Amino acid sequence: VLHPEPDDRFPQADDNALVLSAAIGGQRILLLSDLGRPGQDALLQRIPNLRADIVVTGLPMQREALSDALLDAIQPRVIIVADSEFPAAERASPKLRERLTQRKVPVLYTRSTGTATIEWRKDNWELRTMSGIRLDGRKPALLPEPPPPEISTEAEPAIDLQ
């Protein structure tokens, strides 16, 4: 648990959001929840080295998720934004989408991709979404989901059991 500290008292609930970090197989993931800007600033002040391969964020009610200073500290290889179609306030804004696009890393928005699942391996990870996006931790560029194996529609030859 990286945030909040026991004595933190922010007036907005989003600034007290729980922030978790884990290192799995040499890869680091950072879960920011709906952390607001004052909470992000406090986190950066306490822990300037927040480097993580994957960052998952929600959308705080006020201001935008993932300040530029926070992104500079994290240097993520993949960004997952947990947003939704409804209500409209839970959608990533065009301004946020544009700003994150400029980071030149894959950004996944759950309102478009559906659930994202990360499978950790000994020294790597693979991320898959319900929409068919697949990312490999060794080279996290968006990859199309491989086609399913072909199913034969031909009848199998009968087996004579005599």
Predicted regions and their residues:
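Cap/insert and terminal regions of metallo-dependent hydrolase folds
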Residues: 42-117
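Core dinuclear metal-dependent hydrolase active-site scaffold
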Residues: 1-54, 62, 112-162
